[in-house]
Amino acid sequence: MPEFLDIRPLTRLAFAPFGEVIEADPASMRLINGGTTERFHALAAAEAAGEGARVIINLFRGQPRSFPYAVDMMERHPFGSQSFSPVSGRPFLVVVSEDEGGRPGRPQVFLARGDQGVNYRRNVWHHPLMALGQASDFLVVDRDGPGNNLEEFFFETPFVIKEPAS
């Protein structure tokens, strides 16, 4: 019998063990450019460890997932953080796990609104990008440079995500 994962709304508090939620937070807002622009300052910090490492900006186009979806693997980046911010304004799923002795624990699933992004801290277990409904573009900030910045883990028995409510 498969083990089903519940989908919860993405909130700063619930996501705090894994990184930051990137959204327009009034507490971080300041006016700039003569009062014509609201700047939501320092919502997350990019990490790029190792000699020759640098922070880069990418555009990812995620293809929609089919449901029910089997979460059979997780990945993490030991040398850098990775952030995903939707450019298409569509919701997406965020799947993360706490580390349990060098392997991912039971995954947690969050539904991000189309105006929310996430920043996975360095070394946080997460599932690759999970677009919903249709192909969606994401601005991705992560690390480039020497060294293997990808570790993958495959579960013996996948966890299952039911289709998110519309």
Curated annotation (Swiss-Prot):
Q: Which Pfam families match?
A: Ureidogly_lyase (PF04115)
- Keyword line: Lyase, Purine metabolism
Q: What is its EC number?
A: 4.3.2.3
InterPro entries listed in its UniProt record: RmlC_Cupin_sf, UAH_cupin, Ureidogly_lyase, Ureidogly_lyase_bac, Ureidoglycolate_lyase_dom_sf
Cofactor(s) this protein cannot do without:
Ni(2+)
Pathway per its UniProt entry is: Nitrogen metabolism; (S)-allantoin degradation
At the top level of its lineage, which domain of life is listed? Answer: Bacteria
MF terms in GO: ureidoglycolate hydrolase activity; ureidoglycolate lyase activity
What GO biological process term is on the record, naming one? allantoin catabolic process
Catalysed reaction equations from the record? (S)-ureidoglycolate = urea + glyoxylate
Q: Which family does it belong to?
A: Belongs to the ureidoglycolate lyase family.
Q: How does it assemble?
A: Homodimer.
Provide the function of this protein.
Catalyzes the catabolism of the allantoin degradation intermediate (S)-ureidoglycolate, generating urea and glyoxylate. Involved in the utilization of allantoin as nitrogen source.
UniProt-recorded name of the protein: Ureidoglycolate lyase
Gene this chain is encoded by: allA
